[in-house]
């Protein structure tokens, strides 16, 4: 495997990627937002999610699926955190 290109991430803690025809979907563990970028790294859109401590993402069937880590020391807790891992 060979690295052919790197792009700047639109977020501080990228923790999930999914490439689609619409661009690269990047899950941010810190903000729980999903950022969609093109192949140059240009931000196309930001999608707020109800995810808590996001750790994974996939896109399909017209849906955006994310997963939560549950409790973590990776970022400060928020009042909306459940402390549970869920999809």
Spans of model-derived segments:
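Conserved beta-strand positions in repeat-built beta-propeller and related beta-rich domains
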Residues: 10, 26-30, 66-81
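Inter-blade boundary loops/turns of WD-repeat beta-propellers
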Residues: 29, 38-39
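A short beta-strand motif characteristic of beta-propeller blades
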Residues: 2-9, 42-47
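Extended beta-solenoid/beta-helix repeat architectures
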Residues: 29-32, 51
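Beta-rich, blade/repeat-based domains predominating
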Residues: 7-21, 50-63, 67-71
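Repetitive beta-architecture junctions, highlighting loop-to-beta-strand starts
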Residues: 2, 32, 82-87
């Amino acid at each position: 495997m060979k690295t052919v290109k790197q792009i700047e991430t639109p977020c501080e803690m990228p923790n999930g990627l999914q490439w689609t025809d619409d661009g690269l979907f990047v899950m941010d563990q810190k903000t729980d937002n999903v950022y969609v970028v093109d192949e140059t790294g240009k931000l196309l859109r930001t999608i707020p999610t109800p995810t808590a401590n996001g750790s994974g993402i996939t896109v399909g069937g017209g849906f955006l699926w994310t997963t939560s880590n549950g409790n973590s020391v990776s970022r400060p807790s928020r009042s909306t955190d459940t402390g549970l891992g869920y999809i």
